[in-house]
Amino acid sequence: MKTFILDFLSKALDDFLHKNAPIAESIKKRIEQSERERKELSGIRKIANERAKKANLHNKKLRDCRVHLNAEIPAKNKEEFQIKKLASTIFITEGDSASGSITKSRDVDSQAVFSLRGKPLNSFGLTKKVVYENEEFNLLQHALNIEDGLDGLRYNNIVIATDADVDGMHIRLLIMTFFLQFFPDIVRNGHVYILETPLFRVRNKKETIYCYSEAEKQKAIAKLGGKPEITRFKGLGEISPDEFGKFIGEDIKKDPVLISKDAPIQKLLEYYMGTNTPARQKFIIENLVVEKDDAIEMEPEEVLV
């Protein structure tokens, strides 16, 4: 039976490819490209993995947690351990300043921190070879344990934690491009999130209100009355560890990065992260937003940190 089915499929496929030469040529090119990539990877994978293993012994970029998604459930306290597995989280931050506050305020049982060094590489259009050649990408894939697929994923929640400014938004896009380019299923399966942190702190001697938008700030000012102290958080590193603990605890606000199963990922990446095109230039011009300089526009009672 097996031989019959294989012969039947082989003949049917052969007939189809002969009748559809463009499709056959496209498949041929894809096979040849995959073979070239495989040969390139084989030469650097061993070296990169050896470097990563050495780094993992004392990876300065990773502050790991105790419980991971891929951990075996012990005989005792099964339910409690399962809850911690599902809560396992890794925060990907920009720089040591931001990671410092998170590291000091995190739950060491289920929250890990991975610190990037500034803006990562734009990986759109690159082959997977760059994942092994680029030190940060290689260390990140080993921290997540996704080199061979998602079965060994170590964290259920991958949270991108960047400043809420233009540079921070750019870093978010670069990290998401990395995942969508090389590990799209990690996004499709709902593991990737964006951390929301407050933009303002409005307080008087009796009450403190954290605000995530200008509208929330105005409501807080109206509620407290008088002249409350208003603090504008310019970056994650400027939020104290004591305060940060409130934003990554039970009341954490994180937006899921959602993408449908049939979304044209490559077309989206090409449009937003590829080379400049007239269409993208037009989109940028039509959606350009000029931000006010808070340092200049600051009200007398506001404090900038």
Which role does the model predict for each range below?
Residues 1-305:
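Conserved phosphate-chemistry cores used by DNA topoisomerases
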